[in-house]
C-alpha cells in the first residue's frame, strides 16, 4: 500500500514538473516604474494574467458588499473582475506571471494624463521573458493637477488601505471619496470618518463620505465630514420605515457642522422629484455632480448659473455602477475616476484637503480625457484645449451661449480660442472641448467651471432662467403638498413647508 502511494506521489510530482517546464514566465514592468492598469491578449483575444496577489470580484447590486481578497500581505497585483472582464493593476509597477507559451500583446493605461501603450511578444516554454511598457505623460511639462472622484462605493477596512491607495496611483487619481450609504442596512461601510478615516500616500488620499438618499427628495452627497450624519437614508425605498424627515436642508446643515462639503448627486438627485431648487436658493450647496456616466449636464448647469447660483460643478463615477453601462468596459477609461474633478496645483500633506479647497473656490475642470483651461485678461476670454488624440472642437460659452468655436482638422492635439469680454454686463465664461473618441467610448470631453467677469460686483442674473427656476420649484411645492409625505408629526411638516416657502421667496426676487 505504501509503495503504491509512493508511486502515485512520484507520478504526480513528475506531472507537476512537466507542467512547470512547459510554462512560460513573464516579467512585466513599466518604465519609468509606475503603478498602472494592464490588459493581456493572446492571439488577439483577451487572456487573463495570473497568478495575481489580490482580487476584487465586483457584483453590481443594491447593497455594495464587494470585498477585497488578498493572498499575500503586500500584493504586487490586484485583479478587478466584473461582468467577466478582467482588469489587472500593477500595484508596484512590476510583477511576474506564469502563462502558457504563445504570441501575446499587453496594453497599459494610467489615468487621463498618460498615453496608452502596448507591446507584442512571444513566450516560449520554460523561458522567462521581460517586457517593459513605456509610459509617456502627454500633458505639458510643469502642469500639475489634483484629480478627484467624488463618488465611489467600496467597503473599506483599515487593512484595505494599502491596496486601495496603490489602485488610486495606478489610475493616477489623487483623491478617492469613498461614500457610505444605506439600503436597509449600512452599505459600503467605512471603518472611520474624518481625519481618522483618511488613508494617505504622497499625493494621494482616500477620504470617507456619505450618500444620503430619499425617494421624495433625491440623492445627496456629503464629503469629508468629521462624523456621519444619520439617518443615512429615509423612507421605505432605502431605509426600513415610512419617513419624510429629515429632508436634505436639515441634513446639509448637520453635515456642514461636521466640516463636510455638501452637494447633490446625479445633478438633480436621480429621483422624479427633487429639493435641488430649494437647496440652491437657501445656499446649502457647495457642489453639484454635473459629469457622470459619460454625460455632461450642460443645459441644466448653464440654466442654474444663469439663474444666479454660484455652485461648483464636479465629476464622480458612482463606482462600481459604470462597469456595467458599457460592455466591454472601454480600456481607456479609468475604473476609478472615469470622469474627474481636476484642481490645478500640487497636493499638500493631505491630497483631499488640497482638492477640497479648490472645489470650494470653484477652480475646477471636469474631464474624462482632455485638459481645457480658460482665463480672462485684458478684456479677452482665452481658452485652450489639449489631448494626446486630435481635438475635435473648442468652444467658449458666455452665459450659456456659445460665443466662439474653433474646429480641429483631424490632427491637431491643441486648440486655442478667444473672444472679447463685452463691457458693461456681468457674465460668466467657460470653455468646453471635445476630442476624438474610439468605438465604445462616451464623448471624450472637458469643461471648465465658470470664470466670472462682474461689473461693479453685480451677480449674473438672467431673468428667464430665474423665473424658470421659480416656476419649477412652485410646481414641486404643489406636488409635495398633495403627496401625503409621511411626516411623524405636524412640527416636521410645518418645518419642511416653511423652508419650501422661504426658497420660493428667494427665487422670486
Language-model-detected regions and their locations in the chain:
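Sequence-structural signature of the catalytic-core scaffold of metal-dependent phosphohydrolases
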Residues: 2-3, 28
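A broad, low-specificity signal marking well-ordered, structured residues that form hydrophobic/aromatic
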Residues: 26, 148, 204, 220-221, ...
Amino acid at each position: 500500500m505504501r509503495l503504491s502511494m509512493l508511486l502515485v506521489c512520484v507520478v504526480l510530482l513528475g506531472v507537476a514538473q512537466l507542467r512547470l517546464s512547459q510554462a512560460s514566465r513573464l516579467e512585466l514592468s513599466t518604465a519609468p516604474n509606475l503603478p498602472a492598469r494592464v490588459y493581456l491578449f493572446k492571439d488577439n483575444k483577451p487572456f487573463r494574467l495570473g497568478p495575481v496577489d489580490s482580487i476584487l470580484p465586483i457584483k453590481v447590486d443594491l447593497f455594495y458588499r464587494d470585498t477585497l481578497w488578498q493572498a499575500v500581505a503586500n500584493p504586487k497585483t490586484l485583479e478587478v473582475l466584473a461582468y467577466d472582464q478582467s482588469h489587472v493593476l500593477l500595484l508596484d509597477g512590476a510583477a511576474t506571471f506564469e502563462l502558457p507559451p504563445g504570441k501575446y500583446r499587453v496594453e497599459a493605461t494610467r489615468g487621463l494624463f498618460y498615453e496608452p501603450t502596448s507591446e507584442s511578444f512571444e513566450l516560449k516554454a520554460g523561458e522567462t521573458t521581460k517586457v517593459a511598457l513605456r509610459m509617456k505623460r502627454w500633458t505639458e511639462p510643469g502642469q500639475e493637477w489634483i484629480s478627484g472622484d467624488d463618488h465611489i462605493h467600496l467597503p473599506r477596512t483599515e487593512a484595505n488601505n494599502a491596496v486601495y491607495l496603490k489602485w488610486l496611483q495606478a489610475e493616477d487619481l489623487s483623491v478617492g471619496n469613498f461614500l457610505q450609504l444605506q439600503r436597509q442596512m449600512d452599505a459600503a461601510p467605512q471603518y472611520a470618518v474624518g481625519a481618522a478615516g483618511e488613508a494617505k500616500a504622497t499625493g494621494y488620499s482616500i477620504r470617507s463620505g456619505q450618500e444620503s438618499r430619499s425617494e421624495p427628495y433625491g440623492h445627496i452627497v456629503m464629503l469629508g465630514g468629521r462624523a456621519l450624519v444619520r439617518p443615512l437614508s429615509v423612507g421605505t425605498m432605502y431605509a426600513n420605515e415610512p419617513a419624510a424627515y429629515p429632508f436634505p436642508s436639515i441634513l446639509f446643515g448637520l453635515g456642514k457642522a461636521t466640516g463636510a462639503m455638501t452637494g447633490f448627486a446625479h445633478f438633480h438627485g436621480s429621483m422624479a422629484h427633487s429639493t435641488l431648487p430649494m437647496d440652491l436658493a437657501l445656499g446649502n450647496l457647495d457642489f453639484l455632480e454635473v459629469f457622470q456616466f459619460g454625460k455632461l449636464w450642460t443645459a441644466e448647469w448653464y440654466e442654474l448659473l444663469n439663474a444666479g447660483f454660484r455652485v461648483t460643478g464636479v465629476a464622480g463615477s458612482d463606482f462600481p455602477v459604470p462597469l456595467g453601462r458599457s460592455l466591454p468596459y472601454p480600456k481607456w477609461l479609468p475604473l476609478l475616476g472615469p470622469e474627474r474633478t481636476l484642481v490645478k496645483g500640487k497636493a499638500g500633506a493631505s491630497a483631499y484637503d488640497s482638492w477640497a479647497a479648490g472645489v470650494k473656490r470653484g477652480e475646477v475642470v471636469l474631464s474624462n480625457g482632455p485638459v481645457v483651461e480658460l482665463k480672462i485678461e485684458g478684456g479677452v476670454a482665452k481658452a485652450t484645449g489639449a489631448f494626446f488624440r486630435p481635438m475635435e472642437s473648442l468652444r467658449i460659452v458666455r452665459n450659456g451661449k456659445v460665443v466662439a468655436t474653433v474646429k480641429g482638422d483631424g490632427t491637431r492635439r491643441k486648440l486655442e480660442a478667444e473672444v472679447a469680454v463685452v463691457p458693461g454686463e456681468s457674465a460668466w465664461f467657460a470653455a468646453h472641448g471635445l476630442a476624438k473618441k474610439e468605438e465604445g467610448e462616451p464623448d471624450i470631453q472637458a469643461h471648465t467651471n465658470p470664470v466670472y467677469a462682474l461689473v461693479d460686483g453685480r451677480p449674473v442674473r438672467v431673468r428667464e432662467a430665474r423665473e424658470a427656476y421659480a416656476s419649477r420649484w412652485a410646481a414641486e411645492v404643489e406636488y409635495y403638498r398633495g403627496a401625503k409625505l409621511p411626516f411623524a408629526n405636524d412640527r416636521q411638516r410645518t418645518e419642511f413647508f416653511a423652508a419650501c416657502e422661504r426658497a420660493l421667496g428667494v427665487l422670486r426676487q
